[in-house]
Amino acid sequence: MSKGFFVDTTRCTACRGCQVACKQWHGNPATPTENTGFHQNPPDFNFHTYKLVRMHEQEIDGRIDWLFFPDQCRHCIAPPCKATADMEDESAIIHDDATGCVLFTPKTKDLEDYESVISACPYDVPRKVAESNQMAKCDMCIDRITNGLRPACVTSCPTGAMNFGDLSEMEAMASARLAEIKAAYSDAKLCDPDDVRVIFLTAHNPKLYHEYAVA
């Protein structure tokens, strides 16, 4: 059965446990960075960073709020990145029937028009390595979930912000949580729930969290 995530940003504390767990499980190196006077680190996705907690300070109702957004690939129902890559090589990006995972393979390095693949993503997720055209992003921890384990990011979350299971279960959980918080947050919404397998809940306008929070 198709899988999915429910990401409840109202429960995210920006501990970045998900970000660290993702790197540890995939054996990816830390990103060289510098102190910019802001807490978000690294500043953006890269070839070795598939999960990133974005942090934005916003003035809401006359007070400063810190908004956290644990960003990742949405594993779209109809992934435009794959549709674009398929024009060159239908095996460069795989859409797994069993899980719904959108998986970038090493064959992406042979795609000449990699820029079109990247720009096709409405969430600005894929990144390429400097040495070639090979691209990478969240792989849904497909090696874990096909062996009965949850994704690394989900197992590390201490607050219940990250959730994973059958897509129908995640959709129901997201809808129930939205109804629960609507009284306190009138602008709360689910981000593109009909188009993605990673459903984000935001308490405020999604664009306050990240420019590409919604398509």
Curated annotation (Swiss-Prot):
* InterPro entries membership: 4Fe4S_Fe-S-bd, FDH_Electron_Transfer_Unit
Q: Does the keyword Transport apply?
A: yes
Q: What does the entry list under GO cellular component?
A: periplasmic space
Q: Where does [4Fe-4S] cluster 3 bind?
A: C73, C76, C81, C121
- Copy out the cofactor comment: Binds 3 [4Fe-4S] clusters.
Q: Name one GO molecular function term.
A: 4 iron, 4 sulfur cluster binding
Q: Which UniProt keywords apply?
A: 4Fe-4S, Electron transport, Iron, Iron-sulfur, Metal-binding, Periplasm, Repeat, Transport
SUPFAM superfamilies assigned to the protein according to its UniProt record, in alphabetical order: 4Fe-4S ferredoxins
- Amino-acid positions noted as binding [4Fe-4S] cluster 2 in the UniProt annotation, renumbered to this chain: C22, C138, C141, C153
Name by which UniProt lists this protein: Formate dehydrogenase subunit beta
- Recorded source organism is Megalodesulfovibrio gigas (strain ATCC 19364 / DSM 1382 / NCIMB 9332 / VKM B-1759)
Q: What is the lineage of its organism?
A: Bacteria, Pseudomonadati, Thermodesulfobacteriota, Desulfovibrionia, Desulfovibrionales
